[in-house]
From Swiss-Prot:
Subunit note: Homodimer; disulfide-linked.
GO biological process, one term: putrescine metabolic process
Disulfide bonding pattern of the chain: C177-C181, C386-C412
Gene name linked to the record: Aoc1
Residues holding Ca(2+) 1: D514, D516, D659, L660
Annotated source species: Rattus norvegicus
GO MF annotation list: calcium ion binding; copper ion binding; diamine oxidase activity; heparin binding; histamine oxidase activity; primary methylamine oxidase activity; protein homodimerization activity; putrescine oxidase activity
Stated name of the protein: Diamine oxidase [copper-containing]
Annotated SUPFAM superfamilies: Amine oxidase catalytic domain, Amine oxidase N-terminal region
Length: 746
């Protein structure tokens, strides 16, 4: 017997958040997933600074020949220890921090990671290794603020011979420039082989949206030494030609041997001109009345979700979150109806792989964890980034600093109407009326943050529906990465302005989805449709073609690693050994929304840093040594990265009735177009995936929602509207509702 109403009862209890604690993991336990507090960060930093053998100096010291702490973040405990703590009431694991230290003040500089604990009063330290037997190279480290300051002054000094050249061709300079200064954007990887630190810099005019204002000059600088005096400019590229050094370009310019391009003045004086094309200032006609405000989300009685520390309760859902400084947004212990659906769903990496005609354009392969993907989570604007009704949450990062840095309103949490019913039906009587109408309002809960990695803005969402569906979504916006226009560049992009080329690129995002569908013992299977041709049983002289189900069970990791170009089945199921009352394995379906393709050939030079990008989906057995598919260091040493996802698959482990992890790659090709000026817009530039219950419940769990409306026709008078709303209407006044349901000729 299938007691469907039992699920609805459980979820209804969970919707009454005041009683949720009786069936939830206690909120204080969720702190096992929480980011470090400012006090904990300070305690770790103080502990490290006081260890004389480390010889630490402040990060902001203007030298690279120093030892300094680059990153402090929470070190996630082992899963088995956390589950024993959450599910069995065992002692909680030690709370620890991960600390990344740059050791530059020694003969052989290196980067070393440490675990520091226990918090809040640390007294021990132990070395960590991203990959057994692999030592982090000095050249693989991310660039620090101190290094950027040194780079700016080095470029400023090195280009002094070009001062007049800059003034004549751009109207801007590096010297005495006030509001007409030049700046630069650096690209990566930094060289062509492991151990190098040779960066190309795009020289730009520092105006609003300077990413769209290249000057035509790009500079290659070797900055691999800890001694700035050893840094040197190796090459320059200007308007299609290479030069050995600034002096050569200046000399040839002085005698008229350089094919120069004089740029128009973006800041004219005393003239009425439209706003700069890279500006957000409105221009043109838009026929929506400006004296009428747009729609707003309102919740007059307050939120229907509950936030307890880092744990969120909403309808049948509960989950904990953190904002990992190095890689970004993560959610843990995802439960619906009191049962675990996933242990972790997290952003692992975001890359943008470019093509171009200029050296910087062709070199650019951005691997954004190497640029602080999780730490560039700046303030969200009410009414724009999130509804005004959202709960805004702060973040604290220690990334390239000397203490915790407060990022106000770095995340937001809100419920919103979707504008489409979760489900509805009009039951016609086919006589001009109806038997009944029923509908359930569509609402979702959204947890959101953003990452602004220089020019690009990524909007990261985790979305929760009342029918047990969860969605992960990324929207891409911000400025395109652009280079100087040359006719040859049209093979690699689109001309966006007189001297501007928007370069072709592919965005790829990698997620880790640790599925725990009603427990840690899961299996992976797919369902596909096959056509069968058979004799029609009720008309033997005719044939019948119809779809049939074909189920495939996967037993090894290699079988469940789907490469791009290979057909990926539409129904990807993670199943519990438990069966529902109809005899089907209780499952969750992974549904991927993506237009990604393979960009780099397998094994090609820098591709080793992003081998996860070979697979839209790979399913592996859980291993503690396989917690992350990328690292801080893959960007600047992609030729010998410390984390190589392909190695996760080499042991080809059994994946039947095991603790399974789905690694999901989503993305899209972006060929810039004129409408990307000033910014790429979000419509059409979002990708992600859904986790959908598939025979997990005996019926739709959203039946527990009291947002349902049913209308019954009446022979006389008004139709009867059946609603389930709180008895106490003092705090909730429903808007007027009427429904006729008839249809007739006119």
């Amino acid at each position: 017997m299938c007691l469907a109403f039992g699920w609805a009862a459980v979820i209804l209890v969970l919707q009454t958040v005041d009683t949720a604690s009786a069936v939830r993991t206690p909120y204080d336990k969720a702190r096992v997933f929480a980011d470090l507090s400012p006090q904990e960060i300070k305690a770790v930093h103080s502990f490290l600074m006081n260890r004389e053998e480390l010889g630490l100096q402040p990060s902001k010291e203007p030298t690279l020949a120093k030892n300094s702490v680059f990153l402090i973040e929470m070190l996630l405990p082992k899963k088995k220890h956390v589950l024993k703590f959450l599910d069995e009431g065992r002692k909680g694991p030690n709370r620890e921090a991960r600390a990344v230290i740059f050791f530059g003040a020694q003969d052989y500089p290196n980067v070393t990671e440490f675990a520091v604990g226990p918090l809040p009063r640390p007294y021990y330290i132990r070395a960590l290794s991203p990959r057994p037997g692999h030592h982090l190279s000095w050249s693989s480290r991310p660039i620090s603020t101190a290094e950027y300051d040194l780079l700016y002054h080095t470029l400023k000094r090195a280009t002094m011979p070009l001062h007049q050249f800059f003034l004549d061709t751009t109207g801007f300079s590096f010297l005495g420039c006030d509001d007409r200064c030049l700046t630069f954007t650096d690209v990566a990887p930094r060289g062509v082989a492991s151990g190098q630190r040779r960066s190309w810099f795009i020289v730009q005019r520092y105006v609003e949206g300077y990413f769209l204002h290249p000057t035509g000059l790009e500079i290659l600088l070797d900055h691999g030494s800890t001694d700035v005096q050893d840094w040197r400019v190796e090459q320059l590229w200007y308007n299609g030609k290479f030069y050995n050094n600034p002096e050569e370009l200046a000399r040839k310019y002085a005698v008229g041997e350089v094919d120069t391009v004089v740029l128009e003045d973006p800041l004219p004086n005393g003239t009425e001109k439209p706003p700069l094309f890279s500006s957000y200032k409105p221009r043109g006609e838009f026929h929506t009345p400006v004296n009428v405000a747009g729609p707003h989300v309102v919740q007059p009685s307050g939120p229907r979700y509950k936030l307890e520390g880092n744990t969120v309760l909403y309808g049948g859902w509960s989950f904990s979150y953190r904002l990992r400084s190095s890689s970004g947004l993560q959610i843990f212990n995802v439960l619906f109806g009191g049962e675990r659906v996933a242990y972790e769903v997290s952003v692992q990496e975001a890359v943008a792989l470019y093509g171009g005609h200029t050296p910087a354009g062709m070199q650019t392969k951005y691997i954004d964890v190497g640029w602080g993907l999780g730490s560039v989570t700046h303030e969200l604007a009410p009414g724009i980034d999130c509804p005004e009704t959202a709960t805004f949450l702060d973040a604290f990062h220690y990334y390239d600093s000397d203490g915790p840095v407060h990022y106000p309103h770095a995340l937001c949490l809100f419920e919103m109407p979707t504008g489409v019913p979760l489900r509805r039906h009009f039951n016609s009587n086919f006589k001009g009326g109806f038997n009944f109408y029923a509908g359930l309002k569509g609402y979702v809960l959204v947890l959101r943050t953003t990452s602004t990695v220089y020019n690009y803005d990524y909007i990261w969402d985790f979305i929760f529906y009342s029918n047990g569906v969860m969605e992960a979504k990324m929207h891409a916006t911000g400025y395109v990465h652009a280079t100087f226009y040359t006719p040859e560049g049209l093979r690699h992009g689109t001309r966006l302005q007189t001297h501007l080329l928007g370069n072709i690129h592919t965005h790829l995002v990698h997620y880790r989805v640790d599925m725990d569908v009603a427990g840690t013992k899961n299996s992976f299977q797919t369902l596909t449709m096959k056509l069968e041709n058979l004799t029609n049983p009720w008309s033997p002289s005719h044939s019948l073609v119809q779809p049939t189900l074909e189920q495939t069970q996967y037993s090894q990791e290699h079988q469940a690693a789907f490469r791009f170009g290979q057909t990926l089945p539409k129904y990807l199921l993670f199943s519990s050994p438990q069966k529902n009352c109809w005899g089907h394995r209780r499952s969750y379906r992974l549904q991927i929304h993506s237009m990604a393709e393979q960009v780099l050939p397998p094994g090609w030079q820098e591709e080793r840093a992003v081998t996860w990008a070979r697979y839209p989906l790979a399913v592996t057995k859980y291993r503690e040594s396989e917690r992350y598919s990328s690292s801080l260091y893959n960007q600047n040493d992609p030729w010998d990265p410390p984390v190589v996802f392909e190695e996760f698959l080499r042991n080809n482990e059994n994946i039947e009735d095991e603790d399974l992890v789905a690694w999901v790659t989503v993305g899209f090709l972006h060929i810039p177009h004129s409408e990307d000026v000033p910014n790429t817009a979000t419509p059409g530039n979002s990708v992600g995936f859904l986790l959908r219950p598939f025979n997990f419940f005996p019926e739709d769990p959203s039946l527990a929602s009291r947002d349902t409306v049913i209308v019954w026709p009446q022979d006389k008078g008004l139709n009867r509207v059946q609603r389930w709303i709180p008895e106490d209407r003092r705090c909730l006044v429903s808007p007027p509702f009427s429904y006729n349901g008839t249809y007739k000729p006119v």
